[in-house]
Every structure is written in structure tokens, then in C-alpha cells.
């Protein structure tokens, strides 16, 4: 994974810089996300790693993407195809999203709770995280009944485990040591 990120970073950075210059960050994020989904498609994967000529591969990929990818996005796809790097398009999209979130002072937070959170509870969690992180927070909420009660919050490098199962695991570790 680290190798894919290393390969994808210059493409993501170049695309992000271009998007900033042209005031098109959101449209580029959508375009790269769509292209990444195409590259991850099971019928497309063998073509990306096969021996297809770069020009034909780029033309095929662009035709599959259709109007979802603009001229500049097509140019990125052509350059990546010429360099044999289309298989890292998902990593490019992921890095681009990270650059966009950093630029917009946003962070995506994953909240896993034992029961479904009400919209009021989600709002409280969001406000608390925004204060703590000094960023706008976008919550992705899910449920996991194995937590027993409480929640686990992941936002970037921050992990807050307030679940009962987590507390029991920590207590068990302390008792065993």
C-alpha cells in the first residue's frame, strides 16, 4: 500500500494543484472518484495490468468514463496510461481527497456506535469533534452491536474508544499484567 501511495502521490498533487488554480476542486474530486471506481471494476482490472498498448488503454478507459471525465481529466488518464500507472488511480483519488480535506480544513470522522445515533446525538458528536480538531467534520455513522454500549470515533490519526467492549478489554489487559 505504501508503494502505491508513493507512486500515486505526484499525480494526486499535480491534479490537486491544477484544480486549485482553476477553482475546480470539487469537480476534480468527483471526477477522480468516478475514474477510481472504473479502475476498481472487476472487468477493468485485467486490462490495466495486461499488455494493452498505452494509447489503446487510455482510449478505452476514457470511453468507459464517458462525459464524467473532462478534457484535463482525460489528459491525466493518458499520462498515467503512458507511464503504466492507471492501476493506482484509486490511490490518486484517495490522496486527492486528503489534500482537498486538508485545504478545506475538513476531516472525515467514522463513528461506530452500539445503537443508531439520533440526528441530535450526531450533531453533538460533530460539534465536539469540530471544537477538538478545529476543522469542519463530516460524520460517517455506523452501528456495531458487539460494542455493547458507547462508541468508537476515528478522525484522521485520532481514535477515541468509549465503548464498553473497549473498556472491558483494557480492564482485562490490566488484570493480566
Curated annotation (Swiss-Prot):
Family from the record: Belongs to the ATPase delta chain family.
UniProt cross-references to SUPFAM superfamilies, sorted A to Z: N-terminal domain of the delta subunit of the F1F0-ATP synthase
Membrane topology: Peripheral membrane protein
Cell compartments where the protein resides: Cell inner membrane
First-listed, main subcellular location of the protein, grouped into a coarse class: membrane
InterPro entries hit by this protein: ATP_synth_OSCP/delta_N_sf (IPR026015), ATPase_OSCP/d_CS (IPR020781), ATPase_OSCP/dsu (IPR000711)
Keywords per UniProt: ATP synthesis, Cell inner membrane, Cell membrane, CF(1), Hydrogen ion transport, Ion transport, Membrane, Transport
Species in which this protein is naturally found: Shewanella denitrificans (strain OS217 / ATCC BAA-1090 / DSM 15013)
Record Pfam families: OSCP
Protein name: ATP synthase subunit delta
Amino acid at each position: 500500500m505504501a508503494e502505491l501511495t508513493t507512486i500515486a502521490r505526484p499525480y494526486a498533487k499535480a491534479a490537486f494543484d491544477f484544480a486549485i488554480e482553476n477553482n475546480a476542486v470539487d469537480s476534480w474530486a468527483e471526477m477522480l472518484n468516478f475514474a477510481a471506481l472504473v479502475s476498481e471494476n472487476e472487468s477493468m482490472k485485467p486490462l490495466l495490468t495486461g499488455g494493452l498498448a498505452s494509447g489503446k488503454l487510455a482510449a478505452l478507459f476514457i470511453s468507459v468514463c464517458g462525459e464524467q471525465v473532462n478534457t484535463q481529466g482525460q489528459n491525466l488518464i493518458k499520462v498515467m496510461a503512458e507511464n503504466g500507472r492507471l492501476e493506482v488511480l484509486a490511490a490518486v483519488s484517495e490522496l486527492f481527497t486528503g489534500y482537498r480535506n486538508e485545504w478545506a480544513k475538513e476531516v472525515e470522522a467514522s463513528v461506530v456506535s452500539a445503537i443508531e445515533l439520533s440526528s441530535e446525538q450526531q450533531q453533538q458528536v460533530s460539534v465536539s469533534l469540530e471544537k477538538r480538531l478545529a476543522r469542519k467534520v463530516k460524520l460517517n455513522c455506523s452501528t456495531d452491536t458487539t460494542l455493547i454500549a458507547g462508541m468508537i470515533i476515528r478522525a484522521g490519526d485520532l481514535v477515541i474508544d468509549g465503548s464498553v467492549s473497549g473498556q472491558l478489554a483494557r480492564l482485562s489487559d490490566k488484570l493480566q499484567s
